């Protein structure tokens, strides 16, 4: 899972640091954290990407659980870079699965943000080239009902997503 790789390898420190910043606002926890008496870490798993989604946050009113748009944009850029890096790890994981586990087949769950970080029309796109050299790319085209089910699932349990900067700016302007 690319999202798991993003949340552990590439954004794990950002996530943990956000927890530590929150803990430092509580004197009791701050004292324990500064004396290395407690350890704060996310418990991200293949089935639970909530730490990553929670860190990415939602732009909006802080009193309602939102974060300032500038902070959201910063986190989106972190996520975009992490998405690219994790996708470029695919070849390494494919060869590793063969070498260590003797798996003849490797499935890369690229995640929903792949469309935001690649240009399939560009023959020199580094991510698309890497993926096409190491995998067979499969596009699963969903129906309108599938799209509706994904939207409903996203509302209940948001998946980590990165958005193209121009799209995000346009949607933010429409929102405010």
Label each region the model flagged.
Residues 10-120:
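ATP-dependent small-molecule kinase phosphotransfer cores
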Residues 109, 124-171:
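Conserved phosphate-donor/acceptor-positioning beta-strand/loop module used by diverse small-molecule
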Residues 60-73, 155-176:
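A solvent-exposed, charged loop/short amphipathic helix patch at secondary-structure junctions
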Residues 1-10:
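Short beta-strand-centered segment that lines the nucleotide-binding/catalytic pocket of NTP-utilizing
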Residues 38-47, 146-155, 176:
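Noncatalytic linker/hinge segments flanking ATPase motor cores
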Residues 27-38, 135-142, 171-173:
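Short, surface-exposed, charge-dense and proline/glycine-enriched linear segments
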Residues 3, 53, 138-140:
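Compositionally biased, low-complexity repeat tracts
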Residues 8-9, 115-116, 145-151:
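Switch/connector loops and helix/strand junctions flanking conserved nucleotide-binding motifs
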């Amino acid at each position: 899972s690319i999202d798991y790789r993003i949340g552990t390898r590439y954004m794990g420190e950002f996530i943990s640091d956000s927890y530590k910043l929150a803990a430092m606002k509580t004197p009791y926890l701050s004292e324990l954290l500064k004396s290395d008496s407690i350890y704060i870490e996310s418990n991200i798993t293949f089935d639970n990407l909530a730490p990553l989604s929670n860190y990415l946050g939602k732009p909006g009113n802080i009193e309602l659980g939102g974060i300032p748009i500038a902070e959201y944009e910063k986190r989106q850029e972190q996520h975009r870079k992490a998405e690219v890096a994790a996708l470029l790890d695919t070849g390494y994981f494919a060869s590793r699965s063969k070498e260590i586990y003797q798996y003849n087949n490797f499935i890369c769950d690229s995640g929903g943000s792949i469309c935001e970080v690649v240009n399939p029309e560009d023959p020199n796109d580094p991510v698309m080239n890497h993926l096409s050299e190491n995998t067979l790319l499969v596009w699963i085209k969903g129906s309108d009902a599938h799209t509706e089910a994904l939207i409903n699932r996203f509302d209940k349990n948001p998946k980590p997503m990165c958005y193209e900067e121009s799209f995000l700016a346009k949607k933010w302007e429409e929102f405010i």
